Design a protein with these regions (language model features):
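His/Cys-centered metal/cofactor-coordination and adjacent catalytic loops
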Residues: 47-71
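Short, low-complexity disordered leader/linker segments with a strong preference
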Residues: 1, 21-23
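Sequence context surrounding c-type heme c attachment/ligation sites in exported
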Residues: 23-32, 36-50, 57, 75, ...
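Intrinsic structural disorder/low-complexity segments
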Residues: 5-6, 62-64, 165-168
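Extended rod-forming repeat segments used as scaffolds/tethers
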Residues: 9-10, 176
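C-terminal motif of bacterial Sec signal peptides marking the signal peptidase cleavage site
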Residues: 16-19
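Bacterial N-terminal signal peptides that target proteins for export
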Residues: 1-9
Length: 195
């Protein structure tokens, strides 16, 4: 099923990239939590945010978003076909157990621990086993560093963490994403608008 879902999503994204409107594209098959494959080329996608510092968890995170989702403006919801991938790195530690930092105070990335993916498709939220944890039409996947082997993480925990941010389309760091785009001069949204 994972392969079928990946092929259906890829076909939809190719059609959108080729200029077909999303309305004219056949919708991708419904995907359940744990079935959404990590696209092989995701590190070539626009960066959502990089070097997200999580000293509380001893982690550094890089987040990517596919071109379908990267063009929205502030206050807009991500369209169906959006996929976001998060690389979760262990922060390096000094011999005394403290977290290693760069001269500018940022945590230093160590080994890649896991890869998480979230994708949005029409009706995908209807597949959620616990309706009280529905995050719109988003589904989630959690994989080991190879981005193929399921990590065994409880997807309900992902859903529970994203649930309180419905006003941001269930996407953490939504506002930070737009602030970063404006600050770096990358704020070119559909229709040419800026926040």
């Amino acid at each position: 099923m994972q392969h079928v879902a990946a092929v259906a999503i890829a076909a939809t994204l190719v059609a959108v990239a080729a200029g077909c409107s999303p309305a004219s594209v056949k919708p991708a098959a419904k995907v359940r939590d744990g079935e959404l494959a990590v696209p092989a080329d995701y590190r070539s996608w626009p960066k959502f945010l990089v070097d997200v510092q999580r000293p509380d968890a001893k982690q550094v995170r890089d987040i990517y978003i596919n071109p379908v989702g990267s063009g929205i403006g502030p206050g807009e919801m991500f369209p169906n076909g959006t996929i976001s991938v998060m690389d979760l790195y262990k922060a390096k530690e000094n011999p005394d157990g403290t977290l290693m930092k760069t001269p500018d105070g940022k945590l230093v990335k160590g080994d890649l621990l896991k890869v998480f993916v979230m994708g949005k498709g029409a009706g995908w939220g209807d597949t959620v086993a616990k309706p009280e944890l529905k995050n719109g039409d988003w589904v989630y996947g959690a994989y080991k560093a190879d981005a193929r082997t399921p990590s065994g993480d409880d997807i309900a925990a992902c859903r529970g963490c994203h649930l309180p941010i419905a006003s941001k389309d269930f996407v953490h760091r939504y506002d930070e994403y737009f602030q970063t785009r404006v600050a770096t001069g990358a704020a070119k949204f559909k229709g040419g608008g800026e926040p």
